[in-house]
A protein has these predicted regions:
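Positively charged n-region of N-terminal signal peptides that target proteins for export
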Residues: 1-4
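C-terminal motif of bacterial Sec signal peptides marking the signal peptidase cleavage site
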Residues: 13-16
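Bacterial signal peptide processing site
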Residues: 18-21
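Helix-rich interaction surfaces within compact, conserved domain-sized segments
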Residues: 23-32, 110-171
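Post-signal peptide N-terminal segment of mature Sec-exported envelope proteins
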Residues: 26-44
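Structural motif
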Residues: 36, 81-83, 148
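Post-signal-peptide N-terminal segment of Sec-exported extracytoplasmic proteins
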Residues: 38-68
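Mid-length scaffold segments of soluble, non-membrane domains
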Residues: 69-118
């Protein structure tokens, strides 16, 4: 019975989230065509079970694997600059020297590759690969027709992490 209620709740949340429009279709088509937009992350989905166990052990935890994020996280994509400021919850495979206070995935790249395709459902898929960073990153961004988006970030030094969010016109 609990699993039936859980499935019904997830289906209801999916339907209610899918009907909200984050960016008008004409604006969405324009920013996707120009490849100049902002991705605003609203939720993080860590894959590391150590992080999930810590989250579940905290007082008031609901046993979820989703972290709601404060505004200000995401990335800005322009023709000549890819600026990223995302939190990171997970394990790095090797220690990298740098500022310990500058956690997360934060960098600016001027040398990056973009591959654009369309999924079977008609969504746009961007694969953005950095070239000029010490740690190579691959960003898989699926953009839905209502302006919402799902981002998966993988690296040669960290466990993957995913984010849910929406697009806006580049500032």
């Amino acid at each position: 019975m609990k699993s039936l209620i859980l499935i019904f709740s997830l289906a209801l949340m999916t339907v209610s989230c899918g009907s909200q429009i984050y960016l008008e279709p004409t604006t969405l088509n324009s920013v996707v065509e120009k490849k100049e937009f902002d991705f605003n992350a609203t939720k993080a989905f860590p894959t590391n079970y150590d992080v999930i166990n810590v989250m579940n052990s905290m007082p008031g935890s609901t046993g979820t694997r989703i972290l709601n994020l404060d505004p200000g996280y995401g990335f800005n994509l322009k023709k000549d600059l890819f600026s990223v400021a995302l939190p990171y919850f997970g394990r790095a495979f090797s220690a990298t020297p740098g500022d310990a206070n500058n956690g997360g995935i934060r960098f600016e790249s001027k040398d990056f590759r973009i591959k654009q395709s369309t999924t079977k459902k008609g969504n746009t898929l961007f694969v953005i690969t950095t070239v000029d960073q010490r740690e190579s990153y691959v960003f898989n961004l699926e953009i839905f027709k209502n302006g919402s988006a799902f981002l998966s970030v993988s690296s040669n030094n960290r466990q993957p992490i995913s984010f849910d969010g929406n697009l806006s016109a580049a500032k």
